[in-house]
Structures are given as C-alpha cells and as structure tokens.
C-alpha cells in the first residue's frame, strides 16, 4: 500500500492507550461533539478493523469534508477547545466509503498509466539506442570508404604526375626529332604574336590523332630514324582549294604530337567526351613517294612502342583532365606540335555554353535546334564555316583580344552565329600558319549534351594573322562597313507580294554579294550546311542550295513553286529564295521575335508566321536578351528587321500576349522565308525608327519571354488550307481533315490545342483573318478530337459490341454473322487463336473465392426474385430503454451461430464416415459372394488420337488451326446457309431461354475442379462448403 495511507506512528495530544491508537488521530474527532444519545466508546466493535470506514468518515458528507488526514497537523490545536469540525451527518458513512473506493481505483489507474508510460519510454530509448548504433556503424563504414577514396586520389595523382613526366619526355624527344626536319617549300613564319583571327571548326578532329599519340608514347630514348620520314606521311591536301588564313581544319600531321594530353588544350581543360570524338573523319594517307625501307622502319618502331602502350592505358583511364605546358614555337620549324594536335582555344565558359545552346540557320532560313541533328551530320564533321572572320575590325588589335569585356564577348559570339546559309565551304589545310597559344583564364568549359550525342560540337580556334591578311587589312575595313550598311538596308525593307518582282531583287543581291566577295579577295571554300531531317525535306521542299550561277537559283525557285498547293498561286513558297546576303549581327542575334517588321507603323500587329520558338527556360537565354539590349544602346544607327526565322515543325509555341493580335493585322507586306528580302525601290525614309522605339520593343519582347517561362507551352493552330492527303487522326473522321476541322472549341490560353499537319506555307494577314473567321464559325460545330492514343481507343471502343466469350472460342469464330459474310467458307472449322482440344487441361486455374463467387452468380441467375435480407436504420432516442435492442457485435453473432455450425460439421463427418463404411461393406459383400478368384489382367495400353511423331511427314506454319474432336477435323457447319444452331450464338438465339443458355457459363462443382489438395484439405473443404452430398439420407431408427 502507498505510504500516504499508512497511519502516523507519532503519538499526539489526547492519545488514548487503546488497541487502536490511530482512531483519535484522524481529522474528525468523532466522540467529542457527537450526538447526545451516541455511545461514547471509541469502538463499538473492539475486535473489528475500521480501516476503510474510518478513512471514509474523514471525508464524510459534512462541512469539513476537505479536512482529510493531510490536514492533521493544522487541526491539532483545536482539539482542546472541543474540536474544530462539525459533527457528521446521518448518511455520511455510506457516501464516504464509496468515495474512498473511487479514490483507490483512480490511484491504481494512475499507477498503471505511469507504468505504461515508463515502459513506452524504455522502448523508445532502446530503439533510439539501436538507431545510434546503426548510425555509428554507417559512419565507421563511411570513414573506411573515405580513407579508400583518399588513397585512390593519391594513386591517381601519382599516375597523373608519371603520365605528365612521360609526356614531357616524349615532347622533348619529338622536338629534337623535328629540329632538322623542315620543308623548303613553305615560306618562313613571322614571329609569334597574339592570335587575332577566330575560326570555327568541329571538335571531331582529335580522336585519330589521340589514338596515334598513344601508339608513340615511350619512356626510353628511341633511335632517331623517325626523323628521316618526309612530311608527306599522313597528310592529304585538297588540291582544288586555295590556301588562306581563314581555313585551317585538316592540318598535315607529319609527326605524332604527344605534347597535349587527353583533356588539355592550351592549358585549358575541356570535357573528355569532346576529345574522344575528335579526329574521327581525318584521313591518313601515306605519301606515294615514301620509300619501302622507311615503311619497314616505321612498322618496327610501332612494334616497339606497342609494348609500352599497354602500361599507359591503365594510367590514362584514371586521368580525366591533364595540364600540359604551353608549347614554344621552335625557331625555323614551321610544323609545330600544335599544328598536328589541332590546338583549340575555349574562349570562356559562357561562349561555349551559348554555342551549345545556339541555333544554327539552315539554307532556307529556318532555325534548327542542336538536338534535332541526326547522325547524318557526322559525314560533314570535318567541314565548317570560317569565312566570317574577315569582317571583324576589332580583331586587329591585340589589346582588345586580351581584354575583352562581357559585352564584346557577346558581340563576338553573335557575329560568329551570322552564317551565310547559301555558301558551302570547306576548310582547306594551311601549312604556313602556326597557331599561337594565347593563355586565357583557366575556366573549365562545361559542355552539355543535349539530345543526340552525335551532334557536331563547334569550338573557336584562334589563328595568327598571315601576311595576306595584313596586306588586305586596309581595304577590308571600309568595305566591311559599306557591306554591313547595305545588309541593314536590305533587311529593313519589306518585299511586295508579287512573284515576278522578287527574283530581280534576289539577282541583284547575288551580284552585289559576289562583287563584295571579289573585292575582299579572300577565297571562301564551300561549306556543306547541316543536313536537315528527311521528313522536313519532304514536307517543305527545302533544298541544299549552293553558291552557283543565277540559272541554278531559278531552277530551285521553279522546283519549289511546283511543290506548293495549287490553291495558293499568289503566295511565294518558303524555299523559293535562299538567303544570299549576309545578315548582320543584330539580325542574327535578335530575340525570337513575334513581331513583324519593326519599321512598319506601330499599328501593324504580329504576323502569325513569326511565332515564338520553344519557351526559354534557360537563364543563359535571358542573359543573352539583356546583352542584346545593351548592344542596341551601343549602336543607335542599327536598324533591325524581323529575324529569328521559325521552323514550323519545331516552333508551335506562341506568346500569350501576341495570340489575339493575329486577328487584326492590316499590313500588306508579305514574309518570304520569314525574312524581309531586298527591295531597294520600295525603301522610304519615313519608315526609319529611332533608338527609343527599338529599345522599347526589345523591352516588351524581353517581358514576353520572361512571362512565357511561367506558362506552359502552347501550340498554335495554324490556319492552313485543307489538305485531304495527309491526316494525323486514325481512324480518319468522316469530314476531310484540315486545320479548321480539327480546331477545337475555345479553350483557355494555357491549354495546348492540337495542331494540324505542319505545312510550310506563307500566311499573310488577310489569309489569317479569313481562316480565323472560318475556325470561329466551325468551332461550335466541330467536336474536339485530340491527337492522343486515348482518342483512338475511345473512338474504336464505341463501335465495338460487348459480348461475353464462350468457353474456348472467340466471338468471331462461331458467330453466324461472320459465317454469312464469307470469311469462313472452308470445309472444316478453323480458329485464329492457339486452339487446344484438351479442354480438361484448361480447368486447372482458379481465383480466390471462386466457388463462392460462382455460387452467388448461380443464386442470382436461377431466381432473380430471391429475397435478400434488407434492413433500415431506426433512430432510437437516448432516453429509451435498450432491452429490445439486438446486439450486432461479432462475438454475439459467432456465439449465436456456433451451435448450428458445429451441428453441420458433425453431420457431415457422420455422413462421410457412414459412406466409407458402406463402401467397405460393399467390398466385403462382393468378396464373399464371388464364385471364382479374379485374375489381375494387364492394364490397357494408353493410346491417343493424335498422329505419332514418327508419322509426321511435313510441318506447315499456318495462321488458322483446324479444330479437332476425337482426332478428326470438325466440319464447319456454319459455312452452310441451311444450317444454324440458335443456342451457340446469343445474337441469333430466338428466345430468351436459348439466349441465356448461350451466355451461361459451366457450373463449377467440387467434382469438376481438379484441385491438387491433400486428403485433409479436401475433407475440410467438403465439410465446410455449402454443397450437399447427392445421397439419400436414411432416417435413423429409434431403438
């Protein structure tokens, strides 16, 4: 018992020496102020323990109920004055006892709760300790792994140092080897100077050289017989092309350069996978004049080096980046190491990033993303564009090259993007130019893979200027300014929509362009543009246009005019006019505009062909737009036309702001290839726009681009003329498919709407108004048909009839309608699915609760009017008596039905035992009554209806299998018109009974289900199932 309920052992005042000394010490002095007729003895029953009653009397139903034994010390001084508590009431004893019991029970409950809480806290403490132990184990493992990682890093550092030392030794040996090796054909090189010329080359020109570099890595000093090799080895020059400073991609490689490691160019670290794809298409051809003895010496040299190559393979696998010192230009040696290894200069991380995400302009002025290039581009990987560098005036200053600001870097990148799409150039090898390795900041270029990994990666290569460039430097500057001004005039003048007018302007542009090229006197070899996807070439009629005479241009125009729809004779096709004039940097780097020509009146709205390209979510693109705004501030005299030509196949996103503006266009100017072509006669001075308007429109466009990032991508429904030939919906709808018939009902601006077949057709403002009106009138009538697989399945599902299949056939096999259609006119019945005549094998698979489900189905099918118990809720007021309320608990239900269940199980056990006894008695009776002893016969041989394997004569693969019964083919009676079985097909059944029989499934019984169960399981299933034995019960005789 708790210490609180123990009596105090200390004696107090008025303590009586009695057998029960604890009674006078309670809070209530019972006999001092009791009733006059009450007995004055302390204990009416001296031998009885008053522990519980006296404890409860201290809190009796009188005024001093709060004076319990805890108040004892404070109430002692009042005892001498006759007591400080009122006498108890007559009924205080019973209530006090009840309160005492309640208090003890509550105390016990509290103790129990405390123990439960303690146990719970102990369990939680144990679980936390276990988790701490697990975390300690994990931390120990992590420390072991970190230690191993540090060891691996040290090993990698050692291997890297060893590899660098080997590379330095081999580089020094190659330098000594090439000191005496010189070609007298090449003119002497000027001293090394900072690079001032940027050319673009593919990054796929290093792989072969790197592989050959591994073959020449050696540690020991090799004989110097390799110096005798002429420079013609491994070199192939393009004979038909001139050499000039701007074309250097396939340099002659007379020796194997080991100066650069796998991931290092000019001290710059570049991602390894770029370098692995370099030099793929470089052709190595041994010169025909090489002597046979020298070739044998080279083979012997390779055999010696292959032994040490195996040692360096393991080292180079661990090295992702290497730093190699900058090569010095060897005096008198024009074939420098950097020339063979094709040193590449990564300007900054931003420039590489921009070029990776930049957009290439094809021959028809459409923008293609880098991830759309196929593997077909690999065949052009050794050719690229380097003809634009002659037009940059700032490249002739060394200080500007070394100290570029961010804006100048963006300008440089933007000028590199302005390609002449009609010129096809190839980069000829230049043997008399030595690249100077200019040291930049050691920022590692992060090349990102987008889409196809086989796309062409372009880098910036810097070359030292040559004497020819110095000679042409003075005349280039004024001509470059004049040429750019003429480009600005061309791009800002709209073109009239007539076909005959455009061709003379294009011819003038070609003549002017060719004249400027001749004046610059810098030969520009052909560059094959990046191959476009084949589907786009088929749809758009785009052609690979080369810089050819004017007759070829006219041929291209005639061919593309034939490919356009006949109902649009007054519109020019998109592939008619290849852009010949170079676009300025402002034009090539404009944001993907939704606006028409900026020089037109402000009332001119957005032209629908100028759609926004993919929503720009890259922050680098936002930075690009900001740089363009600064460029417009720096060059106020630049006048821009609408640029960023859109590829309709790619660009189906339109800004939410510019979507409603396409309906109110009043301009009559037409776009050709989404650009304004040259028309000098229609130029007027009042169309010029000031810098503020350009700045304002650029700010609006930047706001639109930022706003479009928060919205989902939208698809523009282009209003194209009806073309019944192409259809994206299968099965095709009844009406001819066009853009207007597919146009759904008006949807929110953020929901993508399905677009029709992309067709590169020029859409003017008048056509847009007409098509928009047509789409508005038909939008209410047409039902939106989304181009999704769900729509196809939903359309087809509405036409199919729902029908239950039979046991072992599909609906169309035994259907009479199929037989009438003539598809099953063979002599024997056939099936188009794997048919099995062993039907008993198909009954081995069952689902859970299959018997009960089948029983329920049979009950519902046999008697649809079967009464099912129903109930309803009857609200019972709280004051009502609960005598008549039925208990619905599971325990009550089981207790109520346990007797019946037990009786049924006992009955079935008796029945099973009785049946076994009867069988045993029948066997004994037959044994006693038999006349002769039965002789065991041999078992019958098991045979089959199927042909034996040795009787097979041929094997035939067919789509339909013959249906057999007992080894014979079943005759197809449904092929005959005079025969029909109504109960086979529910559709042909004339009566409801026949239809129900046709649709009925076989009854599942325990005997028909061959379930592999044990004897105990089978007996339990039989005893506890709802099936009854089909036996006649005998009434037990009462004895």
Curated annotation (Swiss-Prot):
Biased composition (Basic and acidic residues): 255-266, 397-407, 504-515, 523-570
Biased composition (Polar residues): 431-445, 581-592, 609-625, 759-768
GO molecular function, one term: transcription cis-regulatory region binding
SMART domains recorded: PEHE
GO cellular component annotations of the record: chromosome; dosage compensation complex; MSL complex; nuclear chromosome; X chromosome; X chromosome located dosage compensation complex, transcription activating
Phosphothreonine modification, residue list: 434, 659, 747, 750-751, 753, 788, 813, 832, 1014
Entry annotated with the keyword Ubl conjugation: yes
Positions of region (Disordered): 1-44, 171-199, 244-266, 358-454, 485-691, 729-799, 1011-1039
Name the record gives this protein: Protein male-specific lethal-1
Organism, as annotated: Drosophila melanogaster (Fruit fly)
This protein's encoding gene: msl-1
């Amino acid at each position: 018992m708790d210490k609180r309920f123990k009596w105090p052992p200390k004696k107090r005042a008025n303590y009586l020496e009695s057998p029960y000394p604890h009674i006078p010490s309670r809070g209530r002095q019972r006999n001092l102020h009791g009733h006059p007729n009450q007995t004055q003895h302390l204990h009416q029953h001296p031998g009885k323990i008053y522990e519980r009653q006296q404890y409860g009397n201290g809190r009796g139903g009188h005024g001093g109920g709060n004076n319990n034994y805890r108040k004892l010390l404070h109430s002692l001084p009042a005892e001498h004055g006759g007591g400080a508590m009122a006498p108890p009431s007559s009924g205080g004893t019973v209530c006090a006892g009840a309160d005492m019991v309640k208090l003890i029970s509550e105390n016990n409950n509290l103790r129990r709760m405390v123990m439960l809480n303690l146990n719970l806290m102990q369990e939680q403490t144990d679980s936390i300790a276990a988790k701490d132990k697990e975390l300690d184990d994990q931390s120990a493992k992590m420390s072991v792994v970190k230690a191993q990682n540090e060891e691996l890093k040290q090993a990698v550092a050692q291997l890297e140092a060893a590899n660098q030392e080997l590379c330095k030794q081999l580089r020094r040996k190659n330098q000594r080897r090439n000191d005496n090796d010189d070609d007298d054909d090449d003119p002497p090189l000027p001293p090394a100077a900072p690079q001032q010329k940027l050319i673009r080359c593919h990054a796929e020109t290093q792989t072969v050289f790197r592989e050959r570099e591994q073959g020449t890595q050696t540690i020991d000093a090799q004989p110097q017989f390799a110096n005798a090799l002429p420079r013609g080895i491994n070199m192939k020059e393009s004979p038909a092309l001139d050499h000039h400073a701007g074309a250097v991609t396939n340099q002659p490689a007379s020796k194997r350069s080991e100066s650069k490691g796998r991931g290092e160019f000019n001290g710059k670290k570049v991602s390894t996978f770029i370098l692995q794809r370099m030099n793929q298409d470089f052709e190595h051809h041994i010169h025909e004049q090489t002597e046979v003895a020298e070739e044998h010496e080279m083979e012997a040299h390779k055999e010696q080096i292959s032994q040490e190559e195996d040692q360096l393979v393991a080292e180079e696998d661990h090295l992702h980046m290497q730093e190699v010192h900058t090569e010095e230009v060897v005096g008198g040696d024009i074939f420098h190491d950097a020339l063979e290894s094709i040193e590449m200069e990564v300007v900054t991380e931003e420039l590489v990033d921009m070029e990776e995400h930049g957009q290439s302009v094809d021959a028809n002025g459409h923008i293609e993303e880098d991830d759309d290039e196929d593997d077909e581009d690999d065949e052009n990987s050794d050719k690229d564009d380097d003809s634009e560098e002659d037009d940059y005036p700032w490249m002739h200053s060394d200080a500007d090259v070394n100290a570029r600001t961010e804006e100048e870097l963006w300008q440089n990148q933007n000028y590199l993007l302005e390609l002449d799409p009609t010129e096809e150039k190839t980069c000829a090898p230049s043997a008399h130019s030595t690249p100077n390795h200019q040291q930049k900041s050691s920022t590692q270029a992060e090349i990102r893979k987008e889409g196809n990994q086989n796309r062409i990666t372009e880098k910036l290569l810097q070359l030292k200027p040559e004497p020819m460039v110095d000679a042409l430097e003075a005349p280039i500057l004024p001509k470059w300014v004049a040429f750019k001004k003429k480009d600005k005039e061309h791009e800002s003048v709209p073109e009239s929509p007539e076909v005959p007018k455009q061709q003379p302007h294009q011819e003038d542009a070609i003549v002017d362009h060719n004249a400027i090229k001749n004046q610059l006197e810098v030969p520009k070899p052909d560059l094959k543009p990046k191959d476009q996807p084949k589907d786009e070439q088929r749809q758009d009629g785009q052609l690979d246009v080369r810089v050819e005479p004017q007759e070829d241009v006219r041929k291209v125009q005639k061919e593309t005019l034939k490919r356009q729809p006949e109902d649009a004779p007054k519109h020019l096709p998109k592939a008619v006019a290849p852009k010949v004039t170079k676009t300025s940097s402002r034009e090539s780097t404009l944001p993907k505009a939704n606006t028409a020509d900026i020089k037109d009146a402000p009332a001119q709205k957005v032209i629908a062909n100028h759609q926004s390209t993919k929503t720009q979510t890259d922050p680098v693109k936002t930075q690009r737009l900001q740089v363009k705004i600064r460029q417009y501030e720096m060059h106020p005299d630049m006048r821009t036309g609408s640029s960023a030509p859109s590829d309709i196949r790619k660009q189906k996103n339109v800004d939410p702001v510019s979507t409603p503006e396409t309906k109110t266009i009043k301009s009559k100017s037409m776009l050709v290839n989404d650009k304004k072509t040259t028309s000098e006669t229609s130029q007027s001075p009042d169309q010029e726009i000031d810098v503020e308007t350009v700045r304002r429109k650029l700010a609006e466009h930047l706001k639109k681009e930022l706003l479009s990032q928060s919205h989902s991508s939208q698809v523009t429904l282009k209003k194209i003329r009806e073309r019944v030939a192409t259809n994206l919906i299968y099965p095709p709808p009844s009406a001819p498919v066009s853009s207007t018939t597919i146009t759904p009902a008006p949807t929110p601006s953020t929901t993508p709407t399905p677009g029709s077949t992309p067709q590169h057709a020029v859409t003017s403002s008048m056509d847009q108004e007409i098509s928009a009106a047509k789409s508005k009138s038909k939008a209410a009538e047409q039902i939106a048909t989304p181009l999704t697989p769900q729509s196809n399945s939903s359309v087809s599902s509405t036409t199919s009839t729902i029908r239950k299949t039979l046991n072992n056939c599909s609906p169309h096999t035994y259907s009479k309608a199929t037989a009438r259609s003539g598809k099953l006119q063979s002599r024997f019945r056939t099936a188009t699915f794997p048919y099995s005549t062993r039907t008993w094998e198909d009954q081995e698979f069952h689902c859970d609760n299959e018997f009960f489900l089948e029983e329920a189905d049979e009950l519902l099918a046999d008697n649809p009017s079967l009464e099912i118990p129903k109930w309803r809720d009857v609200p019972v007021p709280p004051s009502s008596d609960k005598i008549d309320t039925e208990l619905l608990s599971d325990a009550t239900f089981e207790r109520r039905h346990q007797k019946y269940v037990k009786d049924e199980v006992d009955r079935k056990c008796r029945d099973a035992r009785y049946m076994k006894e009867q069988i045993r008695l029948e066997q004994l009776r037959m044994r006693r009554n038999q006349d002769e002893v039965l002789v065991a016969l041999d078992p019958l041989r098991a045979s089959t209806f199927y042909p034996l394997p040795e009787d097979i004569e041929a094997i035939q693969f067919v789509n339909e299998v013959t249906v057999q019964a007992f080894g014979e083919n079943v005759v197809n009676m449904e092929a005959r018109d005079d025969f029909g079985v109504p109960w086979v097909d529910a559709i042909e059944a004339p009566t409801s009974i026949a239809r129900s029989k046709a649709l009925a499934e076989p009854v599942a019984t325990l005997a028909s289900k061959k379930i592999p169960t044990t004897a105990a399981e089978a007996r339990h299933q039989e005893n506890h199932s709802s099936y009854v034995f089909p036996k006649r019960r005998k009434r037990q005789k009462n004895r």
